[in-house]
């Protein structure tokens, strides 16, 4: 199938992916631009997984103030080099992550950061709710698993649907940027403050403490 220059240009404007990658994705998708976007995202996530072992020791701390000064966020996002940290794509990513935290109020960076105590407390609540249905224990555990998956989406930054594009998670957003920039990127920690709240949300990723990367597996 012949792919026109206009199609390639359109896809590049939508994704910021290299021209050659856009053409290959369009060819694979038989000219369907929406399918080509999906293909590019999947390749970006796969690329992120390959880079997941690389150490991220550069990056930046970004602030975001929202709602007339009532909500504030500080977030540290790391990458491999100062060169990437200065790129517009990285700056846009960090701004979007900070804005997302302000709007969505996550409690943890990754689901692996959820403490055992916090996790068990939620599981017990879901078990009690499911037990009232009178269903057998194996079915109840399946129900609990499903509710925990939803729970992670609600409280873990990387699992949450991205506030500006609900069809992808924040983790997938980061993975796509990794694919574009060619370096591993990880969220190390964040703090969220809201006027009137007692205390603040402070989250530090265990992965960052242990020198691991945060790229999610391809779905």
UniProtKB/Swiss-Prot annotation:
Pfam families: EF_TS (PF00889). NCBIfam families: tsf (TIGR00116). Disulfide bonds: none annotated. Belongs to the EF-Ts family. It is found in: Cytoplasm. Associates with the EF-Tu.GDP complex and induces the exchange of GDP to GTP. It remains bound to the aminoacyl-tRNA.EF-Tu.GTP complex up to the GTP hydrolysis stage on the ribosome. One of its GO terms (molecular function) is translation elongation factor activity. It comes from the Bacteria. InterPro entries: EF-Ts_dimer_sf (IPR036402), Transl_elong_EFTs/EF1B (IPR001816), Transl_elong_EFTs/EF1B_dimer (IPR014039), UBA-like_sf (IPR009060). It comes from Koribacter versatilis (strain Ellin345). Its main location: cytoplasm. CDD domains: UBA_EF-Ts (cd14275). Keywords: Cytoplasm, Elongation factor, Protein biosynthesis. This is Elongation factor Ts. Residues 81-84 are annotated as: Involved in Mg(2+) ion dislocation from EF-Tu. GO terms for cellular component: cytoplasm.
């Amino acid at each position: 199938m012949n792919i026109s220059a206009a199609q390639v240009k359109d896809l590049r404007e939508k994704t910021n992916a290299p021209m050659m990658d856009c053409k290959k994705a369009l060819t694979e998708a038989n000219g369907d631009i929406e399918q080509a976007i999906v293909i590019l995202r999947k390749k970006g996530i796969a690329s992120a997984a390959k880079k997941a072992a690389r150490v991220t020791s550069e990056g930046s701390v970004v602030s975001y103030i929202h709602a007339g000064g009532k909500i504030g966020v500080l977030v540290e996002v790391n990458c491999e080099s100062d060169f990437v940290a200065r790129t517009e794509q990285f700056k846009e990513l960090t701004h979007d992550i900070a804005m997302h935290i302000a709007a969505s109020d996550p409690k943890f960076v990754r689901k692996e950061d959820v403490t055992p105590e916090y996790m068990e407390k939620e599981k017990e609540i879901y078990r009690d709710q499911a037990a009232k249905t009178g269903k057998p224990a194996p079915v109840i555990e399946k129900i609990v698993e499903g509710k925990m998956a939803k729970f992670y989406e609600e409280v873990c930054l990387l699992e949450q649907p991205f506030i500006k594009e609900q069809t992808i998670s924040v983790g997938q957003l980061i993975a796509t940027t990794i694919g574009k920039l060619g370096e591993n990127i990880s969220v190390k920690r964040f703090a969220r403050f809201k006027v009137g709240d007692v205390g603040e949300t402070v989250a530090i990723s265990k992965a960052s403490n242990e020198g691991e990367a945060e790229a999610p597996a391809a779905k």
